[in-house]
């Protein structure tokens, strides 16, 4: 909008990510709350609105909708608009002086001061006549009639009745419906918000290698075999099953057991070394089955209430068809050989790098986009992206936007264990979720500091942390050779501190045998088939199932951004809570951080956060033990053990009285 004298200032807009370069994230069903400083010189009464629309293929023809903003004080304004559909929205702010309300405000002061207001009444009549014309243009004849009649009366000599008409709030309401926006100012940026589907904010992931589904450590399983795991995963309470790469595996420089550089003839290799004579990123490993078998696996998973997430690893083995067909897509050394991949200190001799920003990048990027769309066509709507921080963020921004323009339901999880700013940049350019440093946060202060950072604005506007206590790559020190208590408490933390969490197969069996001196599993499943005994003594399957059931049935635990930490007098006990925005579901949680010994703590319950009075008695339902208690007051004593290291209390306040009984009257 062009500059005008007396312009309104619009500043401090929130949410606004990096001056509007990136979209903020929300979920369908939420309302996008927007705040801004809106002010003008003088004493004019201002009006501010949010202009918003959903971006569609016909967006250029779509009219913008407007919702009013509320004045909060100190020139701060707030408004919100609904996110009813999955996809991208645009929004901005427009504000202008409400000339008629400004006039009525000045008129009242002059009347109260006993001033002659004949001239002011004529000014008001002129303002109303302008509103009449705008009402007629808007085809609102009733409004035009009301405004016109009032304008005629204001041209009569002043009287108490006439002043009552002029100052009537109802007249100002009608006049403000047809404002003079000639002095309006529109914010100089059009901002974006992306509304993801619900699983972006609430989901529970289970990772397993389908090739080990036979569970004998010898026989390469098929997708049909892997379908046999789905009831088990469902019983554990997971709604997303994540599969490592399912494509043909290269033979050149194939890795042997425990990442050995010398593979035996029967070694299955790392599934991240993608591509062989049987095909590349659009093919499935022949020992797993066919593309039709994969589609059947996806459909069977859906029948169990489980979504399939696929690993998206944009890298190739030296045997990948791309290497021969498109050598221009790869990085070459001065001697002409193709570079192998590295993620220092790790080196991947069985993988070669794409030349992401080379002369052939347009055709490379287009092909990789077609890979994603190929798997979307097979029923995959969630991708876990391998090492995205080693590829250009420009590529991810381009790819994710392109895919979501056609398929807004597609989710992308960033597997980037790297520097904080790089991880956050990946969230900004579009990744739906991200792995986190939770894997290495074990104690009270560091857990609270980190979770407060990633679950509160501004970081939570673009970054959703998916908490994993383990991965095939990472067996953290805290879990190495640990007992079930360690696995229970870390699962409880992951599943309640965030609304999205995941674990790699074997966690429920308390598998914790490391390679000495490393954070890696011995006999890692990345390089061999594993014989999983799902009934292994000492497993915590029931604990995991109860945890996921509690998450599923209590909406407070579906929330990502409502996490709040509360006071515990024991540094070995973390106390926190979550609630739905309307307060209809509240859950308090206490988790022991000691896997070896019992811990007691005095918890200070946040009565104001609960909405409870100090003298009020309320019920708590402990979800892991299914025990109910009555609490009163702010202080509660708790004892946690390695066998029961977490307590999850759903809070119920007694609100009903006899007045609500059907026959009270």
UniProtKB/Swiss-Prot annotation:
Positions bound to alpha-maltose 1-phosphate: 255, 315, 350, 387, 526-527
Keyword Ion transport: no
Keyword Lipid metabolism found: no
Feature type site, description Transition state stabilizer: 473
Keyword annotations of the record: Carbohydrate metabolism, Glycosyltransferase, Transferase
GO biological process, one term: alpha-glucan biosynthetic process
GO terms assigned for molecular function: hexosyltransferase activity; hydrolase activity, hydrolyzing O-glycosyl compounds
Catalytic activity: alpha-maltose 1-phosphate + [(1->4)-alpha-D-glucosyl](n) = [(1->4)-alpha-D-glucosyl](n+2) + phosphate
Active site per UniProt: 386 (nucleophile), 415 (proton donor)
Entry EC no(s): 2.4.99.16
Protein origin, superkingdom: Bacteria
Entry function: Maltosyltransferase that uses maltose 1-phosphate (M1P) as the sugar donor to elongate linear or branched alpha-(1->4)-glucans. Is involved in a branched alpha-glucan biosynthetic pathway from trehalose, together with TreS, Mak and GlgB.
Subunit structure: Homodimer.
Family: Belongs to the glycosyl hydrolase 13 family. GlgE subfamily.
HAMAP family: GlgE
UniProt protein name: Alpha-1,4-glucan:maltose-1-phosphate maltosyltransferase
Phylogenetic lineage: Bacteria, Pseudomonadati, Myxococcota, Myxococcia, Myxococcales
Gene: glgE
């Amino acid at each position: 909008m062009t500059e005008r004298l007396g312009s309104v200032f619009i500043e401090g807009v929130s949410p606004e990510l990096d001056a509007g370069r990136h979209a903020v994230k929300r979920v369908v069903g939420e309302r996008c709350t927007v705040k801004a400083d809106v002010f003008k010189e003088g004493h004019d009464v201002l009006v501010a609105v949010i202009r918003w629309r959903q971006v569609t293929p016909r967006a250029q023809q779509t009219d913008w909708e407007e919702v009013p903003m509320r004045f909060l004080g100190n020139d701060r304004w707030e408004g919100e608009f609904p996110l009813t559909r999955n996809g991208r929205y645009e929004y901005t702010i427009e504000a202008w002086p409400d000339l008629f309300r400004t006039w009525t405000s000045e008129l009242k002061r002059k009347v109260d001061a006993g001033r002659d207001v004949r001239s002011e009444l004529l000014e008001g009549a002129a303002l109303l006549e302008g509103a009449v014309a705008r009402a007629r243009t808007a085809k609102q004849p009733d409004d035009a009639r009301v405004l016109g009649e009032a304008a005629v009366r204001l041209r009569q000599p002043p009287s108490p009745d006439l002043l009552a008409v002029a100052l009537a709030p109802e007249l100002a309401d009608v006049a403000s419906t047809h404002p003079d926006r000639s002095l309006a100012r529109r914010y100089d940026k059009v901002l974006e918000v992306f509304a993801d589907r619900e699983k972006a904010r609430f989901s529970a992931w289970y990772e397993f290698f389908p090739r080990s589904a036979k569970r004998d450590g010898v026989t390469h399983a098929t997708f049909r075999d892997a379908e046999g795991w789905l009831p088990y995963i469902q019983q554990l309470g997971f709604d997303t099953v994540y599969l490592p790469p399912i494509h043909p595996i290269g033979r050149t420089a194939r890795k042997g057991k425990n990442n050995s550089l010398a593979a035996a003839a029967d070694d299955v290799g790392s599934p991240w070394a993608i591509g062989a004579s049987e095909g590349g990123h659009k093919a499935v490993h022949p020992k797993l089955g066919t593309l039709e078998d994969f589609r059947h696996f996806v459909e069977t998973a859906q029948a169990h209430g489980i979504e399939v997430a696929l690993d998206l690893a944009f890298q190739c083995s030296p045997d990948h068809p791309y290497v021969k067909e498109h050598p221009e897509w790869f990085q070459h050394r001065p001697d002409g050989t193709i570079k192998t991949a590295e993620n220092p200190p790790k080196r991947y001799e069985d993988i070669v790098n794409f030349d992401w920003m080379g002369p052939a990048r347009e055709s490379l990027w287009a092909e990789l986009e077609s890979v994603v769309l190929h798997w979307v066509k097979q029923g995959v709507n969630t991708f876990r992206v391998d090492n995205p921080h080693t590829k250009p963020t420009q590529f991810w921004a381009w790819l994710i936007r392109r895919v979501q323009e056609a398929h807004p339901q597609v989710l992308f999880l960033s597997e980037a264990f790297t520097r904080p700013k790089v991880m956050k940049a990946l969230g900004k350019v579009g990744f739906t979720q991200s792995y986190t440093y939770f894997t290495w946060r074990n104690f009270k202060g560091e857990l609270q500091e980190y979770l407060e950072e990633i679950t509160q604005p501004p970081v939570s506007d673009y970054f959703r942390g998916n908490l994993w206590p383990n991965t095939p790559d990472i067996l953290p020190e805290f879990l190495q050779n640990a007992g079930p208590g360690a696995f229970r408490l870390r699962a409880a933390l992951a599943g309640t501190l965030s609304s999205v969490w995941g674990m790699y197969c074997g966690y429920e069996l308390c598998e914790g045998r490391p390679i000495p001196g490393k954070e890696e599993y011995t006999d890692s499943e990345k390089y061999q088939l594993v014989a999983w005994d799902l009934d292994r003594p000492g497993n915590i399957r029931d604990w995991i199932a109860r945890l996921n059931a509690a998450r599923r049935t209590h909406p407070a635990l579906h929330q990502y951004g409502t996490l709040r930490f509360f006071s515990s007098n024991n540094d070995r006990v973390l106390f926190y809570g979550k609630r739905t925005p309307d307060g209809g579901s509240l859950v308090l949680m206490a988790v022991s951080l000691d896997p070896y010994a019992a811990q007691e703590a005095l918890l200070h319950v946040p009565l104001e956060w609960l909405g409870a009075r100090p003298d009020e008695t309320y019920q708590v339902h402990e979800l892991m033990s299914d025990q109910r208690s009555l609490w009163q007051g702010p202080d509660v004593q708790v004892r946690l053990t390695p066998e029961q290291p977490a307590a999850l209390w759903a809070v119920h306040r007694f609100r009903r009285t006899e007045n609500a009984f059907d026959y009270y009257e």
